[in-house]
Amino acid sequence: MSLSKASQPSVKSACVRLPIVVLEPNLAELSTSYVGLVSCKCSVLTCSMMRKMKAFTNTVWLFGNPNNPLHALEPAVEQLLDEYSGDLGSYSQQEKSALRWPSGKPSVHFLQAAHLFFSLKNTWAVETGQENWRGFFHRITSGKKYKFEGDMVIDSCYKIDERRRRMGLPDTFITGLNPIMDVALLQIESLLRVRGLTLNYHLFTSSFLDKPLLDSLYFAIWRDKKKDDGSYSQDEGARQDDPLNPLDELLYLSDLPKPLAHYLNKCPLHNIIMHDEEVREAYLNPIWGKDWPALSSSP
């Protein structure tokens, strides 16, 4: 079953015949001219995945699906949003140009909204109707007028996914189904690229489980270093002598109060040794030498 728009249905019969997109949490049920909507039971869901199936989910979560592990909010994301929640006037002219997407005009609306909703956990204004959720989708679709609001929601998800693909980011990081957070992260990525950097996205979502080696704990890394899969180690050291090194101003994961257990399944042993003093002391303690075979011993 392919996903396409129905041929010009009448408005009067739309509520009866047209598919419905549910906007959660309990915000609206919206008619759409798209056909091929499905109720997907898979919790790990992305817009790109649905497009490959030539279908689309019939439920979109404005603040992220609590059952989708790709929408789980890492503490690192909260700190990242805190860093980029300033006013538009705090950015340079070049950075303002990077903030033109998606509305066409420089704006920090999504950055500040993501900070409010995800870092400060304050979503009551939208959930109670004091702030209209439609404004977010109008900005994503650049003010395009729609006969059916469900089309506006689906087109917004598609527009986010297309931006993600153009920027070369994985759909496990930008799912296309978490509109406010997705746009905010794409804007942060655009701001970093002005400085020749890119988000070290493995730190922010469960997408880093796909990568066994995670040597860089900086929130951003040099773009040219990211081309090689094994080049994350010592990103910051390559240009450490540069007095204008943008990495000097970036956040570092070690500032977060996370237990060592958080990293055990995500970092190789040498990385844990590098960043944990107690483990390093235990590892280098000569008392363990007797447990290792001598170099001269025969097998």
UniProtKB/Swiss-Prot annotation:
Stretch forming the signal peptide: none
Start and end residues of each stretch annotated as Interaction with host TNIP2: 148-220
Subcellular location: Host cytoplasm
Residues the UniProt record annotates as site (Essential for suppression of TBK1/IRF3-mediated IFN response): V21, L23
Keywords: Host cytoplasm, Host-virus interaction, Inhibition of host innate immune response by virus, Inhibition of host interferon signaling pathway by virus, Inhibition of host IRF3 by virus, Inhibition of host RLR pathway by virus, Inhibition of host STAT2 by virus, Inhibition of host TBK1 by virus, Inhibition of host TLR pathway by virus, Interferon antiviral system evasion, Viral immunoevasion
Biological-process GO terms, alphabetical: symbiont-mediated suppression of host cytoplasmic pattern recognition receptor signaling pathway via inhibition of IRF3 activity; symbiont-mediated suppression of host cytoplasmic pattern recognition receptor signaling pathway via inhibition of TBK1 activity; symbiont-mediated suppression of host JAK-STAT cascade via inhibition of STAT2 activity; symbiont-mediated suppression of host toll-like receptor signaling pathway; symbiont-mediated suppression of host type I interferon-mediated signaling pathway
Main location as per UniProt: host cell
Cystine connections: none
Sequence segments annotated as region (Involved in inclusion bodies formation): 66-69
Family statement: Belongs to the Bandavirus NS-S protein family.
Function noted in UniProt: Plays a role in the inhibition of host RLR-induced interferon-beta activation by inhibiting the phosphorylation of TANK-binding kinase 1/TBK1, thereby blocking IRF3 activation and preventing the establishment of an antiviral state. Also blocks IFN-triggered nuclear translocation and activation of host STAT2.
Quaternary context: Interacts with host TBK1; this interaction antagonizes TBK1 phosphorylation and inhibits TBK1-IRF3 interaction. Interacts with host STAT2; this interaction blocks the nuclear translocation and activation of host STAT2. Interacts with host TNIP2.
Full protein name: Non-structural protein NS-S
Originating organism: Heartland virus (HTRV)
Record gene name: NSS
